[in-house]
Amino acid sequence: MLYNRLLLASNSKSMIEKGMKSMRRDYNTYLRQFHEAKWDEEIIFDLSVPGQRGILVPQPDEAIVEEVGNGVEDIPITMRRKKAPALPEVHQMRVNRHYMRLTQEVLGADITPDISQGTCTMKYSPKVQEHLVSQNPNLVDVHPLQDPSTMQGILEIYKKVEEMVCEISGMDAFNFHSGGGAAACYTGACVVRAYHESRGDTKRDEIITTIFSHPCDAGAPATAGYKVITLMPDENGVPSLDAMKAALSERTAAIFITNPEDTGIFNPRIKEYVDAAHAVGALCYYDQANVNGIMGITRAKETGFDIIHYNLHKTFSSPHGGMGPGCGALGVQEFLKPFLPVPRVEFNGKDYYLDYNCPQSIGKVREFMGNAHILVRVYMWIKQMGA
């Protein structure tokens, strides 16, 4: 037994060293050197062996069962399974080996960028989309300064994607210029300021957020010059309504909230927060970084939010890309539309055109109109989902 363990440790060290060597980066080209996997791994259901177990589900103590019951009896009969779920029966070592081999098989698919981290869930990015956006001359050969009459296709996609995400969110207008979620959050903070200033309400210099909201909900408004108030959770895991009301005042410009929060928990008090903020004249900003968990179940409009952003490079199946490229889609209710960045893509019944005639706009937030290829991926993915 001891010999086998030592042999396994020795082999593991050798395998790790070989793996490190195969993944060594060439700093002349900044590309990784890697070897292709020499196997074709089966799907995990084909590896199933009746009776194998990776873990043993812990059983409750008898005292707990006597106090609260076994739990199953409380589930309505109509909701109980008639037979056990068809899950693969695989021991722990085989599971580890299986997923390790899968990662090695896809190692060369996207070798150039590093894999970045995110607190929000990512979707799969179909390779058919990558082929189109990287090789189709109708996209890759378009220059943003050419005449709009010569790029009607991409302008139509801009407009169609806007209509789609408006329907999904309940918002009335979207802007796709921001290069990511935090950039959209900053743009949103600027829109909030422009709205209050248009009404002569210049004393509102505070933004309220929660500790488990996306970090940019505090960072972006602070960068825009706001004082940020961060609420902490109570014993239920979310800030109390009383804490929110105590923080709100005539100086509150908006609340910036992520929901579900970065803990993965949906905040059930969100509608109460929105109503309390509106009662003091503040706007409500919805960071939808974690919207995958509630997509198609509820919309920002029904909760009462005035302004939101989606991360198109996460929620709508465009690659996360290792810090870029991305697209932060900023959506607003109709009364905030005049403040969105320019230019806006509009349709006059015949042609798509760029509208710069927006006197209340906050102006441009970046060069040109954002990352157009992201919107092509989004358009394809939404269509593939049945839109």
Q: What annotation goes with each model-predicted range?
A:
Residues 163-190:
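Short loop-beta-helix segment that forms the pyridoxal 5′-phosphate
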Residues 5, 152-153, 183-352:
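Conserved PLP-enzyme active-site core in the AAT-like
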Residues 79-80, 135-148, 166-169, 222-232, ...:
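Gly-rich Lys/Arg/Thr-decorated short loops/hinges at beta-loop-alpha junctions or inter-strand turns
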Residues 95-111, 161-171, 310, 353-360:
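Short, hydrophobic/aliphatic alpha-helical segments
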Residues 139-145, 149, 154, 173-177, ...:
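Phosphate-binding active sites in nucleotide-utilizing proteins
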